[in-house]
Amino acid sequence: RIAAIYFEQTLYLRALDEFQLVVAANDHKDPHVLMARIYESQGRLDKAIEEFEILRNLEPKSMDILLYSARLYSLDEKMDVAIKLLQNATEMEPKNDQIYHSLALAYMSNQENGKAVESMKKALVLNPKKDSYYFELGALMEKAGDFKGAIENMRQAIEINPLHSNAHNFLGYIYALEGRDLDRALEHLKKALIIQPRNGYFLDSLGWIYFKKGDSEKALAQIQKALIYTDPDPVLYDHLGDILFSLKNYDEATGAWKNSHSLTLHNKDDLGGEKPNPQTLQDKIEKAKKLIQQNY
């Protein structure tokens, strides 16, 4: 009781001392759960994991304990262990779509996208009405270069949830990248922006569609708005450079590409999705410099 009071008052060090006395006298589940929560809140994932290993021994058939253990290992970047635990969970509850979904996300974090696709497909077989599963499967397929599969799954997500703004954005952007169905792409982006009018990435997609349609002035206006609503992003600066270059504003295009190049190199480990090629950016910069020199 004293330990619980300390916990509620966020006097965590005192609570830990009391909980350790409790488990020494009578080992059971609740103190270990609360100690793990304290350790996690203090950034001591190693100690939180230790508590959940004790819990797994106390209650080896508890799905909640197994899944939370997997979560902690994932946060501690021990993805192989997290994946193994989630695989065990699928054996315990083979008809639980949420577990297959969690396993797919773990595979994604471990850069095992092929296995992530298979797990996501299993989740969808068990729950074919979940729009987020279709969206995530579509994103995985796009990353693998399967644009047809990506488009099909994004459409399915929208069929289930017409207000799925991210799916509308994704579809519009894929169409723009391929340079086809640009009017349809525009429709999707307008729907996405009705739902999230200040989403910088949606505005970037809209700008890129205008650029592909040959309207660089409209494209520039959207990209400039996009930069207001996002953190510095190398893809947006690359797009900005391309648009400025098309408008023959070579000085500013060079500056935009330099920003993109710098962000790409300095944040290369943090860029999970699309990112510019540094050499391509350098080539663009050199081309713009030559044109600037020719104009003098």
What are these regions (language model features)?
Residues 1-296:
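Alpha-solenoid helical repeat scaffolds
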